[in-house]
Amino acid sequence: MSSFRSIRSAIALLLVGLLCEITLGEVPILAIDAVYPPVLSTAHPNPLKISAGRFTQDIDALVFSDPRISAVLEPAPNLALDDVPQKNFGSFTVTVDPATPPGFYEVWASGRYGISNPRTIAVVPTPVEQLPGNIDPKNPIEVKPAICYVGTTKRSDTVIVKTKKTDHWPKCLIAAQVLDAATLPTLTVTDGKQTVLSQLRAQGKRPILFETPTVLPRQPVDEIYLKIYDFLYRGAETASFALVIDPPENHPLLTTAAWKPPFSVFEESLASWPTVDPGTIPANGLFPAPAWQTTIELTSQNPKAQIEFPVAEGQAYECEVFSASQGQLSDIRIVADRIAPAPTPEQLIEIQAAMDAPSGTALDPALEQRVKDYRPRIQTAGREVIAIAEDGPGAGTRAVRLSSADPIATIPAGPVTKNVRLSITDLQMTPSGKWPTRLTLRVGPAIPRFHAVGHWVPDTNNAVQAKTTGVSLSKGGQCAMQVSVRRAGGFAGPIRVTCENLPPGVSVVPAIIAPGQTETQLIFYAEENATSWVGTIQPVAKGTSTDPNNAMQELAVPIRAGTIALSASGDRGLPQSRLSSQWQLKVIEQEVAPIQIRAGDGPDWVLEIPLGGSGKLPIKAVRRAGGDQKGVMRPQNLPAKVAFGEFELPPNAAEATPEIKVAADAAPGEYTVWFQTEIILKQSLHPESHARLVAYRDRIQAKLADPNWAGDRPMAEKIIAETNPKIDALAKEIAPRDFPTFLSCAPFKLRIVPAPEAPK
């Protein structure tokens, strides 16, 4: 009987990975929502498993952001009566070189349906132990220092562990969201009599850190109990956490610096200016004339900072704050006003006397002016406000937002007889706030610049539905990268976007982000003869500006990779996105894409239309099996005053020539337009599972057909009897099915030129 159970287990092993996801309606692209454990040790080999995701079939390799971390796919037990080696797809043994610095890294999974989105992992020098999922609350596990424990929260269950109290209260660290986990951990600390000593909840990406009780126990305590659960009660494989007792001050899980929101790119590539230490500025003293940068800390006791500095004749300045971009839960406001220099001590005595004088007292005109100049220092009425800034300008998509709560403002040129005063507050700060707000302030001449962030286009641009996504570029197919930019420092020109380091057989159509636009898409195409490839690529954005001597200079910045770290959901709200360290691309060679749609005649082709004119756009489609349905093509990123509505690419049609009309008052320039094509594609999902089961059945049949085979013939006959119905059922499951999709495709350059002059 046990041998027959092993037969069923063997067949189930071949089927796993297909049937669990067979009902999904989206085009197959690998995405992972969790790896477990999310912490790796340099002290020993680490088991690591892809614990949650979509289209995770045949994950056979991991890519790490550091080459000193490597993974080997674990083998699976051989199938019954079979000697062909099997693979335990999605399960690995990971080795971390002891020379790898403790910190945060990224991992990508490579499988049948592309390469996944990155997931954050931490590397620690101590052993890592996994907490069991069924801890008896009456007999909790004891956790000790010098070990990193990892666990998951399951629905409303509470993970209970205990630790010793020695001559000091043990410091207890719990990290979760900095590891891309969906957990919002909550910690309740009790003594042995279940008296609550502290209750703590994570704030954003910050870890929980218990150091001393909020309520001191009445009796001596030898050990404390830690009750850990997910505040939102939605625990699952994606809701993991890490626990460390008495971590050293440099423990990587104590910091959130590695988890960078997309808008943190605004702080990158900026020239370093002289740093001013606020502690060296005397009370009511002046900062030097810009350019400079400084670091300020706001607290509930000191929630407002004021900085005053002189200005240069005719010089405008740019003032920018970086706080939320550094992981702070802040919302900074800056108010800039012009103010007369502070009076001397002798003048201040005269001013105070004049202000205390009875109403109607005649004053010397010079003294009256000094009183007038002094009042804005002690009251808000009458201030010469020149700038107010809160949130930065918005950009990005609803999936990966490039909008920052950090303000940026322009201080216009003004008279040197007055200083500029900056009043800085955090609108999120409360009188009982526990956490200080740290910020970097830069003030200096405007530097023309732009920053760019991209992300692989998810299957939806609806923020309520956006979820993690990887990338899969099939032979003869296409995939898309959304690119968002923010201009600053007076730069307002066009930005050219392209990609470098592409493999043979893969090309990209360069794009233009015109003045006034902030978005475009890069469309990647693979030829039919492209070969399998996995590697890093480098998208870049370029523009031109003038230097201080009015000479033309090229600006070039890498397009930073953005990724959805947490999918949108009803209980956790909009998707959460962060920056990634690199771009990974995978070319799939197992199949050819059902359709490829292009516009024009090559990547450098331009459709030129004069103002008030029209033109025909040649659309060409290469259709293959599964790509014969009609497509509704909707143009994206159209400039104003250009008429170009959606149109149909009829079933099986290989060409279309829609008309574009340009109004006489449109803005001349060069633009990139692409299409979002709504189409139903037919594909077989993971046909390899069927082929493997057939091959296994055939190997067993071959053994039975061999008269010299001395194996267990009754078991072999049983295997065949149980396998044949599975093969028939699986043949139906892998039959091509409909995948409704929105395909980004057919980019082209539209050049709008002035109308030709009428003949005289």
Which residue ranges define each predicted feature?
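Aromatic sugar-binding surface patches on proteins
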Residues: 80-93, 205-207, 403-407, 516-522, ...
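Proline-anchored loop/turn motifs at beta-strand termini and strand-loop-strand connectors
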Residues: 37, 65-70, 97-99, 164, ...
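Acidic, Ser/Thr/Pro-rich low-complexity intrinsically disordered segments
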Residues: 26-78, 89, 148-249, 254, ...
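Bacterial N-terminal signal peptides
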Residues: 10-22
